[in-house]
């Protein structure tokens, strides 16, 4: 089993982190700067930022002083929102025993356990904010390393 983001989801998280580093509702960040800072493909970065804007997480401003910024403070943006903006709803859609849609949820021995695991993952993403990621990122940059379990308090 591989629980991983698609490339689009990965890029969306990195782009949101870049905007969050600027303090959220602060100054606008140029598309080019997001791409360079977060090692994103320059040709794909505008699409990723548009996904965040369409989800109401970021806003764009045209012009010399334009770019993108978060619409809310980083502490109010859950990682789950960013992931779902890029990936769609984080749900249990495939039967792990038979593949395809799950039609046996009321009689399946695995369904309850699998649903609980998915919900635990959703809860973790819901409780982790962009401010948490900025704090963890700063700790890593300062040589503190990656937290062993969870994120440090913001």
Task: Describe these PLM feature segments.
Residues 36, 53-54:
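Alpha-helical residues within the helix-turn-helix
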Residues 74-99, 110-119:
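Conserved segment of winged-helix/HTH DNA-binding domains
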Residues 54-57, 85:
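Residue cluster at the C-terminal edge of the helix-turn-helix DNA-binding motif
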Residues 99-154:
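C-terminal regulatory/oligomerization modules of transcriptional regulators
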Residues 56-71:
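Beta-hairpin "wing" of winged helix-turn-helix
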Residues 45-53:
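Basic amphipathic alpha-helical segments that dock to polyanions
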Residues 3, 7-40:
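N-terminal helix-turn-helix DNA-binding core of bacterial DNA-binding proteins
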């Amino acid at each position: 089993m591989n629980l991983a983001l698609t490339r689009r989801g990965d890029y969306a998280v990195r782009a949101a982190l870049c905007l969050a580093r600027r303090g959220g509702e602060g100054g606008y960040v140029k598309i080019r700067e997001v791409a360079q800072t977060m090692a994103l493909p320059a040709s794909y970065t505008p699409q990723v930022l548009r996904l965040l804007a369409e989800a109401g997480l970021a806003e764009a401003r045209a012009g010399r002083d334009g770019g993108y910024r978060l619409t809310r403070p980083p502490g109010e943006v859950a990682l789950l929102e960013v992931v779902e903006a890029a990936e769609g709803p984080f749900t249990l859609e495939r039967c792990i025993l038979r593949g395809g849609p799950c039609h046996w949820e009321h009689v399946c021995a695995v369904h309850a356990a699998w649903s609980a695991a998915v919900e635990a993952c959703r809860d973790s993403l819901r409780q982790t904010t962009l401010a948490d990621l900025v704090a963890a990122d700063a700790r890593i940059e300062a040589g503190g390393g990656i937290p062993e379990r969870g994120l440090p308090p913001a």
